[in-house]
């Protein structure tokens, strides 16, 4: 399996574990921000904050194709991660739509990362950020 095939279900688990299964859009937006922050915490020492923010901005831009209401990636202050403005956009949506959009942004981030460093390394880093989201079987299939 590739990162793309396993990432979206894993991200739904991340958001559900953090926000709860019957969460409102505010809780989902907060969970998405925390998920991004955990990922950035793992990736920033390896790639630097500027690279992480650039990949995030690109992820938001690509997700806007499906969710045109997402905050423009360029609307963030230079020192803010683009995801901070996405949170406001997510809070204004129906919970199901907010979940789909949050998953799209975070999954696109993971997919872009996989293009740069490969599926195996990406899966390992994603597992470091969200250890409960990936089952052992999924990780074994992805890394072998």
Language-model-detected regions and their locations in the chain:
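Long, compositionally biased intrinsically disordered regulatory segments in eukaryotic proteins
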Residues: 1-144
């Amino acid at each position: 399996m590739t990162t793309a095939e396993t990432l979206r279900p894993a991200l739904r688990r991340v958001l559900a574990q953090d926000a709860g299964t019957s969460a409102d859009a505010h809780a989902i937006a907060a969970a998405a921000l925390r998920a991004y922050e955990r990922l950035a915490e793992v990736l920033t020492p390896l790639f630097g904050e500027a690279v992480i923010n650039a990949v995030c901005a690109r992820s938001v831009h690509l997700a806007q194709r499906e969710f045109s209401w997402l905050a423009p990636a360029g609307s963030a202050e230079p020192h803010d991660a683009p995801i901070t403005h996405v949170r406001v956009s997510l809070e204004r949506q129906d919970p199901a739509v907010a979940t789909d959009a949050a998953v799209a942004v975070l999954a696109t981030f993971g997919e872009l990362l996989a293009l740069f460093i490969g599926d195996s390394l990406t899966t390992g880093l994603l597992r470091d950020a969200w250890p409960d989201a990936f089952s052992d079987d999924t990780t074994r299939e992805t890394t072998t």
